[in-house]
A protein has these predicted regions:
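Signature of N-terminal electron-transfer/Fe-S-associated modules in redox systems
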Residues: 1-181
């Protein structure tokens, strides 16, 4: 039986076994290869996507559990690499081999959608499930701070009454930028 879900804002219907992992559906059924296979056991984070805004390991997520939900992959984070995390990643030149990086970016985007100004320890905690064999962790941390600063710079003038935007407003702007749709 076909399973209906929304991927990167578009309704999709996939006729696959209900226990097929979401990662398989993305890569093999839909041809969206930006999300990577690393371990297949929820140990490396390479396969991270957002499901209803939550960073999730797609390698262990049965497609049946995603029915009716909203999935965002690296391909849908922004139409033109304009998401603050993508811009920061480019500016800091984070990737080395690049294999882990779509998962890293998706975890970072989910973190910033919830916490607009994370500390080093909050970044480390949120990103600890994303393994990088090339050891780009220092640059990842720097890029998350840079993305947070970019977002803050664009968000602060938003209110005319002098009040700072609420966390909800910041989240809304990040979601609208593609962070957690
Ligand atoms: S491939 Fe999913 S966590 Fe490693
Ligand atoms: S950049 Fe090579 S594994 Fe992370």
């Amino acid at each position: 039986m076909a399973i209906q879900l929304t991927i990167n804002g578009k309704p999709q219907s996939v006729d696959v076994p209900p226990n097929m992992p979401l990662l398989w559906v993305l890569r093999d059924t839909l041809g969206m290869t930006g999300t990577k296979f690393g371990c297949g056991m929820a140990l490396c984070g390479a396969c991270t996507v957002h499901i209803d805004g939550e960073a999730t390991r797609s390698c262990i997520t049965p497609i049946s559990s995603v029915a009716g939900k909203k999935v965002t992959t690296i391909e849908g984070l922004s139409p033109n690499r304009s998401h603050p995390v993508q811009r920061a990643w480019i500016e800091v030149d984070v990737p080395q081999c690049g294999y882990c990086q779509s998962g890293q970016i998706m975890s970072a985007a989910a973190l910033l959608a919830k916490n607009a100004k994370p500390s080093n320890s909050e970044i480390d905690e949120a990103m600890k499930g994303n393994i990088c064999r090339c050891g780009t962790y220092q640059r990842i941390r720097e890029a998350v701070h840079r993305a947070a600063a970019m977002h803050a710079a664009s968000a602060k003038p938003a209110r005319l009454d002098g009040a700072l935007p609420t966390d909800d407003a910041l989240d809304k702007q990040l979601v609208e930028a593609g962070g957690a749709a």
